Amino acid sequence: MSQAKILVVDDDPDFVEAVRLTLEPNGYTVVSAANGDEGLAKVKAESPDLVILDVIMSSVLDGLQMSRRMQENPQHKRIPILMVTSIANTDYAALFPTDEYISIDGFLSKPVAPKVLLERVAALLHR
């Protein structure tokens, strides 16, 4: 059985490393990108099984734009997306669209507890 490949798209290297340190010891392969454009390139190159995606990166709602672009591509629209953000604690919270506006498979607020992250990743990969 091959390892599931997880793409983490976040401009915070500390968060990316924390996710890597949580997932890799549990049998996952982790690749990363620092913004939406780089993330889309990694989706094409790496064919991840799951994308963990921050909302706000190089621009406000950069992650939402990436998720929309993934949904527009038939080869990528079936890849589950777990959205993570600290947006609930910022002035941008009012800009966050409803679930009807974007297609994501799960949402977690930062900071994310390792146990919760592992549970959500496993659930999304085995749905």
Q: What are the functions of these language-model segments?
A:
Residues 41, 64-77:
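Short amphipathic alpha-helix used as the core "switch/output" element in two-component signaling
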